Amino acid sequence: MASTKPLSRFWEWGKNIVCVGRNYADHVKEMRSTVLSEPVLFLKPSTAYAPEGSPVLMPAYCRNLHHEVELGVLLGKRGEAIPEAAAMDYVAGYALCLDMTARDVQEECKKKGLPWTLAKSFTSSCPVSAFVPKEKIPDPHALRLWLKVNGELRQEGKTSSMIFSIPYIISYVSKIITLEEGDLILTGTPKGVGPIKENDEIEAGIDGVVSMRFKVKRSEY
């Protein structure tokens, strides 16, 4: 798939980060939530990107920052109302991603019936790995994701456990949001989410594909 911009640096120019919540039943259970008939969507700004080598910044207003490891899907061309059967034709590649979440803030937002923006969209809330070309992952539904904090395994799960498949998600999202080249879709997290603190080291990976490391620092704001 020809690209007019370097997908290897997607975090520098990609516009939209679309996130899917509640896409693994075991995570839905641990969060005491309910599996819904359609994907739960929320957005992160492009300033949420944190490529490997930069720190994960814990907002000053957050007292309970959680890690969520996810498979990210990179779009290679513009599309709207994409048929599910053609959805994979729009995929240029993948990235391992973290959906960093201010859990205490999110819980307050839920209680008040407010959007999750304060909990999900802060600077560096979307750490990402290097770009992985589509050809290196023949089946994105046959991957093992894992995450460690200070060497301790916290999360592991298989993408085969997704409730909504990647083609379905792409099609569903594109009927609401026009997707563009360089856009990233986070496809949900398996169970095992948990807290991190300042100076922790997060290591995450996709077995046999890619891994990444990040240090956690406290933001001044």
Swiss-Prot record:
The modification N6-acetyllysine is found at K110. GO terms for cellular component: cytosol; mitochondrial inner membrane; mitochondrial matrix; mitochondrion; nucleoplasm. Keywords: Acetylation, Cytoplasm, Hydrolase, Isomerase, Lyase, Magnesium, Manganese, Metal-binding, Mitochondrion, Phosphoprotein, Transit peptide. Transmembrane segments: none annotated. Mg(2+) binds at E68, E70, D99. Ubiquitous with higher expression in the liver and the kidney (at protein level). GO terms for molecular function: acetylpyruvate hydrolase activity; acylpyruvate hydrolase activity; fumarylpyruvate hydrolase activity; metal ion binding; oxaloacetate decarboxylase activity; oxaloacetate tautomerase activity. The modification Phosphoserine is found at S37. Oxaloacetate decarboxylation is potently and competitively inhibited by oxalate. Pfam families: FAA_hydrolase. The modification N6-succinyllysine is found at K112. Homodimer. Tautomerase that converts enol-oxaloacetate, a strong inhibitor of succinate dehydrogenase, to the physiological keto form of oxaloacetate. It is thereby required to maximize aerobic respiration efficiency by preventing succinate dehydrogenase inhibition. Also acts as a weak oxaloacetate decarboxylase (ODx), catalyzing the decarboxylation of oxaloacetate (OAA) to pyruvate and CO(2), and as such is likely a regulatory enzyme in the TCA cycle. Also displays acylpyruvase activity, being able to hydrolyze acetylpyruvate and fumarylpyruvate in vitro. This is Oxaloacetate tautomerase FAHD1, mitochondrial. It comes from Mus musculus.
